[in-house]
């Protein structure tokens, strides 16, 4: 409800309409839709959701009036999106300055154990980036930019320990929450010196679950069975056989212990009692605007605000900022250049071969299955917000 209210407020302000414009009952919608002659475009125009209804050629001619003609296929003096991004967000200069620095470490994706590539957060690989910032004498403060629904509890703690190491080295760490910083995403943010979120950030989800997937029923349906002998009841447990009740008890006890640790670390970091943390925990999610009142977030703002806060905490008057990135291998550099040049062709092909609704739904299911299949916590214990998916 909070996210929906934020959405209505933003769109209403941008379009100059009343928020009640969105609170349409089914009866009211049918009445307006009938008045629009069953035309969705007319319905949108009458509700002031769009400014005009035009054909592509009419839009093209209007663009020509605005920016002039060109010899490209559209006949309009346009700038490609990639070129636009390069202008407004140019690559950071390679030349090193002698100024003190605020380092930005990006943690985006599901948190997994070990070393992971961009798009996921590796416990070891992200910890290495934080360590790199700690060992750089020019870095005086760090912003940890988080966009994650969580993941492995073990990997989350590996990252949090590096945050503590930075603080022990006298370098303040500010957490900047993006779309998500839930569950494991909050775990790695909790111990930072200050937490800054956007009003619509989904955070909290302080909870733990354990998972060990077995497939004996599916295999039984196919007539496939497995058996064996072991030195104890817990020896040789397998995904192709039912989970032993004793192992289930061990997993449950570990989940309870991890949840207790989660409550404890948040309690210590946020200056709250364990009972106060538990009252807003238990897996519940909160918007950034609500999280401030609950004591889970310190300030509303952007990553730029986080950089300013980090510089102030480090008492820096003049400073540079830079993103700490892992060093690419020669093979990765080659493929990056190759795919960078191929993106224009691929982009046009994808637009011309847009997926059907059925294919898109199939891809959505595959994405959800993929998240589960990649989970690799060594103890099968996860701090992951599975329902954190905004539509």
Where are these regions (language model features)?
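Charged, glycine-interspersed solvent-exposed loop segments at helix/strand-loop junctions
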Residues: 1-64, 216, 220-310, 314, ...
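Flexible, acidic/glycine-enriched loop-and-adjacent beta/alpha segments
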Residues: 54-77, 176-232, 301-317
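C-terminal intrinsically disordered, low-complexity extensions immediately downstream
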Residues: 305-337
């Amino acid at each position: 409800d909070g996210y929906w209210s934020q959405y209505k407020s933003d769109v209403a302000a941008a379009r100059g309409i009343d928020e009640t414009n969105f609170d349409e009952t089914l009866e009211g919608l049918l009445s307006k839709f009938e008045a629009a002659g069953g035309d969705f475009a007319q319905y949108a125009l009458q509700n002031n959701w769009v400014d005009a209804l035009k054909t592509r050629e009419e839009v093209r001619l209007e663009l020509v009036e605005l920016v002039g003609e060109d010899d490209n296929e559209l006949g309009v003096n346009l700038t490609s999106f990639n070129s636009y991004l390069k202008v407004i967000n140019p690559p950071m200069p390679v030349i090193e300055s002698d100024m003190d620095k605020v380092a930005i470490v990006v943690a985006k994706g599901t948190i997994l154990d070990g070393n992971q590539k961009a798009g996921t957060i590796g416990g070891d690989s992200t910890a290495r980036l934080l360590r790199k910032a700690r060992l750089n004498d020019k870095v005086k403060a760090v912003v940890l930019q988080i966009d994650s629904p969580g993941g492995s509890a073990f990997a989350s703690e590996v990252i949090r320990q590096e945050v503590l190491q930075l603080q022990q080295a006298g370098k303040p760490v500010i957490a900047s929450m993006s779309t998500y910083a839930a569950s494991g995403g909050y775990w790695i943010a909790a111990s930072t010196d200050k937490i800054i979120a956007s009003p619509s950030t989904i955070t909290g989800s302080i909870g733990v679950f354990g998972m060990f997937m077995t497939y004996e029923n599916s295999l039984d349906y196919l007539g496939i069975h497995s058996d064996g002998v072991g030195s104890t009841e817990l020896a040789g447990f397998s995904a192709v056989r039912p989970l032993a009740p004793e192992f289930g008890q061990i997993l449950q006890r570990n989940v309870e212990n991890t949840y207790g640790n989660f409550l404890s670390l948040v309690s210590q970091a946020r200056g709250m009692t364990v009972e106060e943390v538990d009252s807003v925990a238990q897996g519940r999610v909160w918007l950034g605007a609500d999280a401030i009142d609950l004591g889970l977030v310190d300030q509303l703002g952007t990553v730029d605000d986080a950089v300013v806060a980090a510089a102030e905490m480090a008492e820096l008057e003049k400073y540079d900022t830079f993103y700490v990135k892992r060093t690419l291998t020669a093979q990765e550099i080659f493929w990056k250049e190759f795919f960078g040049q191929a993106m224009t062709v691929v982009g046009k092909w994808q637009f011309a071969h847009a997926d059907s609704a059925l294919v898109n739904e199939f891809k959505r299911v595959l994405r959800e299955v993929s998240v589960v299949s990649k989970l690799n916590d060594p103890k099968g214990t996860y701090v992951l917000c599975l329902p954190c998916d905004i539509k």
